[in-house]
A protein has these predicted regions:
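N-terminal accessory/capping or targeting/presequence segment of soluble
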Residues: 2-113, 125, 129-269, 330, ...
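Conserved short loop/turn motifs at secondary-structure junctions
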Residues: 3-8, 119-126, 171-172, 202, ...
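Generic, well-ordered alpha-helical scaffold segments in large soluble proteins
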Residues: 18-21, 111, 136, 186, ...
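Amphipathic alpha-helical
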Residues: 24, 28-32, 350-372
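Hydrophobic/aromatic-rich, well-ordered segments within soluble, folded domains that form packed cores
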Residues: 56, 65, 313-324
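Conserved catalytic alpha/beta cores of large enzymes that bind or transform nucleotide phosphates
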Residues: 108-109, 116, 120, 244-311, ...
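Terminal amphipathic helices with adjacent charged low-complexity linkers/tails
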Residues: 132-157, 283-319
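Active-site-proximal beta-alpha loop/turn segments in soluble metabolic enzymes
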Residues: 160-169, 312-316, 336-346, 383
Length: 388
């Protein structure tokens, strides 16, 4: 993956392409976040723009690019890794959380002139984070503006979005109908009549569907709109391939609208509705859509699915315990095999051990995928908390 991102052009060339775009738009700076339109913790390749720009492969970071400077913030898990990967790139490492190091908002306010214009992709920043920048900027007359097309203009050879098929999650302990009943009750309690979800794990939980659009995360790229009358899933129709999925959607009265048509449909469908939106879990572009192109009234509040899916019933708790037992057994088998190899004088590599561990887990009943790539490190590599 890293080679795919980095071989065609240098970091300097990629940054210059972005600077050309910044200049064309009349901006003083550009903000890059490590996020996708669903604000996922782990990203599909299509949305790894920060990695493409910088060569930094950690899972968390943000960048600020001006006409003559480029800075990257990341937390202490990645300081050593970032220092290695940014060396010689001209990108300054900002150790987020270290004493005396300003965050991106503070740095922009301290280093840009009054009335400066800053741009970002509104799809990859939450509404609450966007507001925090606006509040900080307002004291100096600065403005943050969203531009959706910049990433495509700058990122040559950008990977296409994944079109992996969706499947029905059959090991569920609660029906879609029962979950929808709970969600609608919570939505009404919040003073709304509709709920728009963008967080992929919440959508997978509520629909009892799974996907594989993000490595180590069984989710699928989508939005979900729940009203008192209907449920609409915004997803690429090519992902719906099997009779089981089609039957599941029909049985649960879930309508499908193409992901590419979501903006127009959401704006029209929510006219006159009171829609509950979680400003920490919905991107700024969604908020702007409803405020500017729909007569919907936005009710700000936490999405009820976050709490509901965290409450496990007895059957689900037993499944969690069984998962831990199976994983523990896989680890025991792995360590036993490792002891045998070392006793026989074999010296496996980090990659070989990661593959061995995966293989032991994959043998277990009900295995779907790893929750994250195994972190196996020897020597100096062991100093990197998220080494891969």
């Amino acid at each position: 993956m890293e080679n795919q991102f980095l071989m065609s052009t240098s970091v300097t060339q990629r940054l210059q392409a972005l600077r050309d775009e910044i200049q064309f738009l009349g901006l003083n700076a550009w903000l890059v976040t490590s996020a996708d339109p669903h604000l996922s913790e782990h990203l599909p390749e299509h949305w790894m723009f920060l990695r493409y720009l910088s060569g930094f492969t950690g899972s968390y970071g943000c960048m600020v690019i001006t006409a003559d400077r480029a800075l990257l913030w990341t937390d202490s898990r990645y300081w050593e890794q970032a220092a290695r990967q940014l060396e010689g790139s001209g990108i300054e490492l900002m150790r987020f959380g270290a004493e005396g190091v300003p965050n991106a908002r503070q740095w922009l306010c301290e280093n840009l002139p009054e009335n400066a214009q800053v741009g970002c992709d509104p799809l990859t920043i939450s509404e609450n984070d966007f507001r925090r920048f606006e509040i900080a900027f307002s004291e100096r007359g600065m403005i943050l503006t969203g531009y959706i097309s910049v990433t495509d203009h700058v990122w040559k050879g950008r990977p296409h979005p994944d079109v992996a098929p969706i499947s029905v999650f059959t090991n569920t302990q609660e029906s879609v109908a029962r979950k929808l009943e709970k969600v609608r009750k919570a939505v009404h309690a919040a003073g709304a009549d509709s709920l728009l979800l963008g967080t992929l794990e919440d959508i997978a939980w509520l629909t009892n569907l799974r996907g594989s659009d993000i490595a180590c995360t069984p989710v699928f790229t989508s939005y979900l709109l729940v009203t008192d009358e209907d449920v609409t899933l915004y997803v690429d129709p090519t992902k719906i391939q099997t009779a089981d999925v089609k039957k599941h959607l029909k049985t649960n009265s879930i309508s499908v609208v193409a992901y590419s048509d979501r903006r127009a449909h959401i704006a029209q469908h929510l006219n006159g509705h009171r829609v509950l939106l979680d400003a920490d879990a919905v991107n700024h572009a969604v908020y702007a859509l409803l405020e500017q192109e729909s007569s919907a009234y936005v009710v700000a509040g936490e999405r009820p699915t976050a709490l509901l899916k965290s409450r496990k019933n007895k059957a689900e708790l037993e499944l969690l315990k069984e998962t831990m037992r199976q994983d523990g057994a896989a680890l025991c088998e792995f360590f036993a095999r490792l002891d045998e190899m070392l006793w026989d004088g074999e010296m496996p590599t980090e990659q070989e051990l990661a593959e061995m561990l995966h293989a032991e887990r994959a043998k277990r009943k009900g295995f779907v995928c790893d929750s994250f790539p195994a972190i196996v490190a020897f020597g100096a590599n062991a100093a990197l908390p998220h080494y891969n």
